[in-house]
């Protein structure tokens, strides 16, 4: 968990001509978020998209202890590191934000889109939130 951005940076470094897009959840992104700095310093333009649902896994009833992460503004951190960054709160803002970010990637920047998502949303094929450890 949390290996998406390091892998994306590695792919871009190994194949500079590749179009690299990394999609992360907020919890896993937090584990290796500073790899954005690596991408910026080494001029590895890629697009990183974060689904910020405020916690580990989906919890429709909000009753799982230790799940809450809050809605971290990773876009502000990304911008401070030199990325082009946007924060999106409404579904209709996603496509335009991705288009603007991808344009910046094509210009040689690291693009970053932090998308606030519903904490109740989850995949229906795999229910990680119902797994017990």
Predicted feature locations:
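Thiamine diphosphate
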Residues: 1-133
């Amino acid at each position: 968990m949390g290996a998406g951005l390091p892998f994306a940076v590695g792919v871009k470094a190994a194949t500079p001509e590749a179009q690299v897009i990394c999609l992360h959840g907020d919890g896993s992104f937090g584990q290796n978020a500073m790899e954005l700095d690596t991408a910026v310093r080494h001029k590895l333009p890629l697009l990183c998209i974060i689904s910020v649902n405020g916690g580990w896994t989906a919890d429709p009833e909000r009753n799982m202890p230790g799940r809450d992460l809050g809605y971290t503004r990773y876009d502000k951190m990304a911008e401070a590191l030199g990325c082009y960054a946007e924060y999106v709160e409404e579904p209709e803002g996603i496509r335009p934000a991705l288009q603007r970010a991808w344009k910046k990637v094509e210009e040689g920047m690291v693009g970053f889109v932090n998308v606030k998502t519903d904490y109740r949303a989850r995949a229906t094929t795999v229910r990680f939130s119902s797994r017990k450890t």
